[in-house]
Amino acid sequence: MKVTLIAILTCAAVLVLHTTAAEELEESQLMEVGMPDTELAAVDEERLFECPVSCEIEKEGNKDCKKKKCKGGWKCKFNMCVKV
């Protein structure tokens, strides 16, 4: 019974250490991204206008308005590109 308890506690300790190490690695990788927050905000602002602009162009050409698909993990919703 003692051996089982020791084995369970050891596994729990290893799991906690592994999880902590994985979180630290993920945080360090996120901080190494080269694009500053201001550039990301500019990209997001551009994406918000992508769908309605393409839709208006199609309306002016007397065609049925079909939303252009957004690319790169974005989709059209409510005439805006939103992150999927």
UniProtKB/Swiss-Prot annotation:
The superkingdom of the source organism is: Eukaryota
Q: What is its main location?
A: secreted
Q: List the disulfide bonds.
A: C51-C65, C55-C76, C70-C81
Pfam families documented for this protein: Toxin_20
Signal peptide start and end residues: 1-22
Keyword Iron (UniProt): no
Key words of the record: Disulfide bond, Neurotoxin, Postsynaptic neurotoxin, Secreted, Signal, Toxin
Q: Where's it found, cell-wise?
A: Secreted
Q: Would you tell me the protein name for this molecule?
A: U4-theraphotoxin-Hhn1n
